[in-house]
């Protein structure tokens, strides 16, 4: 959906969040015009998914014991045809990759948002990883395409250059905002924003809009402040102030089609 539609419809985003950044994530959804729900109580899943437009699962502080309840949550979303966004933090680590694979085997996710190392795992490619950040070399566009084809999900790879692919069509946003990597909450918030934009229809274009919104907000914020603490708050302000016309102009100018 476009930003004006998002503002008019106020999509409700159910976040199965980590324990580190839930307030920042909730604020980000709120300032763009959505409505956040932050919940983990299994008994509430059916009722909350029934009124939600998107479900976002973040595995950043996931415990193995939570696998079954996460699968149940996504299965409920699948039954109601509610978009599911997966943020598979550090999935390349074996203790995390095994439960994520079990999750994918038993439920369906529509969009996967991660850094290059995380997305490479879904593509079956060895890509150097260090914590939540990714380092290494390789054709990130091809990695995203392969991951999309293997999972059947839209891939939203965030980094110095963002890559969005459904396996057939791939878009690249080559705008680097280093300060975005200095705040762990911006990636988590991005996943939730992706959920909000895809609440009415799952599409590559809606995912591109979400990625571009965070990148443009970060870029504008970096022109206002230069330190991480102030930057995080400024990003929220820029998300709030961003107009549809500025967002669409930014997309038209900066987003490239990968051939």
UniProtKB/Swiss-Prot annotation:
Catalysed conversion reaction: 5-(2-hydroxyethyl)-4-methylthiazole + ATP = 4-methyl-5-(2-phosphooxyethyl)-thiazole + ADP + H(+)
Keyword flag Nucleus: no
Pathway field: Cofactor biosynthesis; thiamine diphosphate biosynthesis; 4-methyl-5-(2-phosphoethyl)-thiazole from 5-(2-hydroxyethyl)-4-methylthiazole: step 1/1
Keywords, in A-Z order: ATP-binding, Kinase, Magnesium, Metal-binding, Nucleotide-binding, Thiamine biosynthesis, Transferase
MF (Gene Ontology): ATP binding; hydroxyethylthiazole kinase activity; magnesium ion binding
Enzyme's top EC category: transferase
InterPro entries attached to this UniProt entry: Hyethyz_kinase (IPR000417), Ribokinase-like (IPR029056)
E.C. numbers: 2.7.1.50
The protein, known as: Hydroxyethylthiazole kinase
Organism phylogeny: Bacteria, Bacillati, Bacillota, Bacilli, Lactobacillales
Family: Belongs to the Thz kinase family.
Residues that coordinate or bind substrate: 38, 185
């Amino acid at each position: 959906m476009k930003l004006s539609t998002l503002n008019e419809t106020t999509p409700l985003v159910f976040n199965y969040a980590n324990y580190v950044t839930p307030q920042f994530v909730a604020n980000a959804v709120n300032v763009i015009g959505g409505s956040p729900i932050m919940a983990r109580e299994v008994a509430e899943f059916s009722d909350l998914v029934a009124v939600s437009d998107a479900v976002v699962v973040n595995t950043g502080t996931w415990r193995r014991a939570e696998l079954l309840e996460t699968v149940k949550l996504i299965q409920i979303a699948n039954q109601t045809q509610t978009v599911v966004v997966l943020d598979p933090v550090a999935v390349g680590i074996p203790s995390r990759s095994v439960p994520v694979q079990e999750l994918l085997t038993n439920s369906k996710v529509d969009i996967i948002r991660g850094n290059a190392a995380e997305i490479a795992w879904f593509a079956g490619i060895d890509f150097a990883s260090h914590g939540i950040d990714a380092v290494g070399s390789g054709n990130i566009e091809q990695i995203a395409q392969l991951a999309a084809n293997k999972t059947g999900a839209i891939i939203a790879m965030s980094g110095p250059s963002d890559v969005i692919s459904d396996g057939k069509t791939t878009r690249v946003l080559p705008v680097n905002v280093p300060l975005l990597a200095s705040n762990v909450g911006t990636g988590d918030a991005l996943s939730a924003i992706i959920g909000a934009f895809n609440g009415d229809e799952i599409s590559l274009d809606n995912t591109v809009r979400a990625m571009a919104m965070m990148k443009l907000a970060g870029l504008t914020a970096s022109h206002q402040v230069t330190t991480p603490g102030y930057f995080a708050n400024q990003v929220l302000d820029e998300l709030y102030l961003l107009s549809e016309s500025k967002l669409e102009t930014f997309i038209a100018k900066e987003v490239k089609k990968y051939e």
